From Swiss-Prot:
Keywords: Cell inner membrane, Cell membrane, Membrane, NAD, Quinone, Translocase, Transmembrane, Transmembrane helix, Transport, Ubiquinone. Belongs to the complex I subunit 2 family. NDH-1 shuttles electrons from NADH, via FMN and iron-sulfur (Fe-S) centers, to quinones in the respiratory chain. The immediate electron acceptor for the enzyme in this species is believed to be ubiquinone. Couples the redox reaction to proton translocation (for every two electrons transferred, four hydrogen ions are translocated across the cytoplasmic membrane), and thus conserves the redox energy in a proton gradient. GO terms for molecular function: NADH dehydrogenase (ubiquinone) activity; NADH:ubiquinone reductase (non-electrogenic) activity; quinone binding. A construct which produces a protein lacking the first amino acids has only 5% of the wild-type rate of deamino-NADH oxidase. This is NADH-quinone oxidoreductase subunit N. Residues 1-7, 56-70, 126, 180-202, 256-270, 318-325, 394-407, 476-485 are periplasmic. GO terms for cellular component: membrane; NADH dehydrogenase complex; plasma membrane; respiratory chain complex I.
Length: 485
């Protein structure tokens, strides 16, 4: 197979991020300079984002048997790059107070971003597995980056061991699917899995094991046990990446698998996914009710958000609207999570031991950092799905898709879950406006809005509000990603 200039243009984001990894590695070997390496990383990620315009001009194509570049891949690549950029900008002030090696942080984020881009373009079970490993392995190091803290190290060990187990399930499931179908390409799977084939025990077992592996990576019930501990133990900028980039990339590739291979046509698989979605929505919200740690609360709430997205995935067979729903919901979830975790990162910067993540640290924040408190309020309202925010548009889409596909009990679960979610999100928002404690705890720097992280947080809040009132630009972008399938 010959690689043409057209193919190289299609692979630009992947090549640019890969080149940035090499440049940052050489820069660290040459001389440790925190500012230089952070700047190189941000320039590389921005260049990869800009290159998406050229990719769009090249059109949709299968670059290799493992990768397909089209509108869908571009949308998810863009979301992963935005999340990686935000992670780097939040990490810079946080690392300023960190006494050990700072520069490797950016290297690990870039390698994980590379895995995310590979997942967005994956068109084959081999590239799906490679992408998941490429995004997971750097996260083992990132979660335990504050290794002098017992909690961070414990979170890293938990995540490493459980992630390895999940990967083995995923790989074994792929082996069974291959044994039955004789191919690993998504398109070939779609052709080979004809009538009645999906009821073969070996194939059902294979897809079942794959659901276990992917369910762990997406922290769906009952494979979610690592989520709250890892979110709490990981440094705040890493929790940002975990909650956004890794979830978006993996959900994107699962979406593509379901589009090409008729996995959702099997009644057994649909029932299993529906039960997982129902349990994730209800359990995630109920567990978040009693949390007094913001990162744990956001960890449990992410379980329920993935449950909502699963409703749209189950309804995928009913039409293109569910693809639109997932795109809009993930964009809303990305900006809301970036804002919420960004506030936690700003409150925890520079590094001074554990993050400012207890609810008590945010009590009365409005009285000395009013804009920051307003941003956090907007993010909580968006995550709760209150009208006039982007979170509401996403949730409305999911409900519409559920109704269209007659998934009545899942629609009921979404409504009940949203009602429960409203309580704990508003609890965080209300605590920002209570009387400040006598002895103030951690606080964001007074000039936070002029820092790169502060600007990212403000832009996220602005996007959540503007797109919540006028979502048409976002819907148009998501629709552009559809016809190129």
């Amino acid at each position: 197979m010959t690689i043409t200039p057209q193919n190289l243009i299609a692979l630009l984001p992947l090549l640019i991020v890969g080149l940035t990894v090499v440049v940052v590695m050489l820069s660290i070997a040459w001389r440790r300079n925190h500012f230089l390496n952070a700047t190189l990383s941000v320039i590389g990620l921005n260049a990869a984002l800009v290159s998406l315009w050229f990719v769009g001009q090249a059109g949709a194509m299968d670059v290799t048997p493992l990768m397909r570049v089209d509108g869908f891949a571009m949308l998810y690549t863009g979301l992963v790059l935005l999340a990686s950029l935000a992670t780097c900008t939040f990490a810079y002030p946080w690392l300023e107070g960190y006494n050990d090696n700072k520069d490797e942080f950016y290297l690990l984020v870039l390698i994980a971003a590379l895995g995310g881009i590979l997942l967005a373009n994956a068109n084959h079970l081999a590239s799906l597995f490679l992408g998941i490993e490429l995004i997971s392995l750097p996260l083992f190091g990132l979660v335990g980056y504050a290794f002098r803290q017992k909690r961070s190290l414990e979170a890293s060990i938990k995540y490493t061991i459980l992630s390895a187990a999940a990967s083995s399930f995923l790989l074994f499931g792929m082996a069974l699917v291959y044994a039955q179908s004789g191919d690993l390409s998504f398109v070939a799977l779609g052709k080979n899995l004809g009538d009645g084939m999906l009821n073969e025990p070996l194939l059902l077992a294979g897809f079942g094991l794959m659901i276990v592996g992917l369910g762990f990576k997406l922290s769906l019930v009952p494979f979610h046990l690592w989520t709250p501990d890892v979110y709490q133990g990981a440094p705040a900028p890493v929790s940002t990446f975990l909650a956004t980039a890794s979830k978006i990339a993996i959900f994107g590739v699962v979406m593509r698998l379901f589009l090409y291979a008729p996995v959702g046509d099997s009644e057994a698989i649909r029932v299993v996914l529906a039960i997982i979605a129902f349990a994730s929505i209800i359990f995630g919200n109920l567990m978040a009710l009693s949390q007094t740690n913001i990162k744990r609360l956001l960890g449990y709430s992410s379980i329920s958000h993935l449950g909502y997205l699963l409703v749209a995935l189950i309804a995928l067979q009913t039409g293109e609207m569910s693809m639109e729903a997932v795109g809009v919901y993930l964009a809303g979830y990305l900006f809301s999570s970036l804002g919420a975790f960004g506030v936690v990162s700003l409150m925890s910067s520079p590094y001074r031991g554990p993050d400012a993540d207890s609810l008590f640290s945010y009590r009365g924040l409005f009285w000395h950092r009013p804009i920051l408190a307003a941003v956090m309020t907007v993010m909580m309202l968006s995550l709760a799905g209150i009208p006039m925010t982007l979170g509401f548009i996403g949730k409305f889409y999911v409900l519409a898709v559920g109704v269209q596909a007659h998934l009545w009990w899942l629609v009921g679960a979404v409504v009940v879950g949203s009602a429960i979610g409203l309580y704990y999100y508003l609890r965080v928002a209300v605590s920002l406006y209570l009387h400040a404690p006598e002895q103030p705890g951690r606080d964001a720097p007074s000039n936070w809005q002029y820092s790169a992280g502060g600007i990212v947080v403000l832009i996220s809040a602005l996007l959540v509000l503007v797109l919540g009132v006028w979502p048409q630009p976002l819907i148009s972008i998501v629709r552009l990603a559809m016809p190129l399938m």
